[in-house]
């Protein structure tokens, strides 16, 4: 396509230092590792990771490839930043991207630089509870499935029951949000959101 060649040229000119790839599919991620073309892989990774996700992290390490953990808080479903930080700190080849939405959250993560949370039994209990409640196939809110041909806000609607349980529910129960949820009745069953 010429895109990779353009990145190589930019690297040769000193315009960029590294070439990485981002995706959400395990098979594509493994192909990227095996290709040897990329220096980093950006992939969803958090303490809700499956064994296959953990294997991907190890495969990157074996290949000398950096691993950038996106969705480290699972699009807001993980609400204990100390547990998330302590879990990811176990992996010396993983650099998380924290989805900071408020200044207070930024302050929280900045405080971990000087005082990093350790994976204590109490934090492990938080992780175990969240895994029991959340692990498996669920929407992380990335929005890659958008736009929906029926006008459904897939990334919000698919996560609604989880968000009501895990976040302040008032924002999810507005008339506007209820109207957006009713759009589900117009679903075309095209499978784009799978």
Q: Model-found features: residue ranges?
A:
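Structured C-terminal cap/extension of enzyme domains
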Residues: 55-194
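Glycine/proline-rich, positively charged
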Residues: 1-68, 73-76
């Amino acid at each position: 396509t010429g895109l990779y060649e353009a990145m190589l040229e930019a690297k040769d000119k000193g315009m960029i230092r590294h070439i990485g790839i981002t995706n959400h599919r395990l098979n594509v991620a493994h192909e990227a590792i095996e290709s040897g073309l990329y220096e980093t892989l950006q992939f969803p990774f958090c303490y809700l990771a499956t064994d296959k996700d953990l294997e991907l992290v190890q495969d990157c390490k074996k290949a000398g490839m950096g691993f950038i953990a996106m969705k480290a808080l699972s699009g807001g479903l993980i609400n204990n930043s100390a547990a998330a930080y302590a879990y990811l700190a176990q992996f010396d080849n993983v650099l998380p991207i924290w989805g900071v939405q408020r200044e207070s959250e930024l302050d929280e993560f900045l405080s971990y630089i000087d005082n990093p949370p350790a994976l204590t039994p109490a934090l492990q209990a938080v992780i175990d509870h969240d895994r029991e409640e959340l692990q498996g196939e669920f929407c992380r809110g990335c929005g890659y499935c958008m736009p929906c041909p029926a006008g459904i806000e897939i990334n919000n609607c698919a996560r609604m029951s989880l968000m009501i349980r895990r976040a302040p529910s008032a924002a999810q129960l507005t008339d506007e949000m209820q109207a957006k949820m009713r759009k589900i009745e117009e679903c075309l069953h095209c499978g784009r959101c799978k």
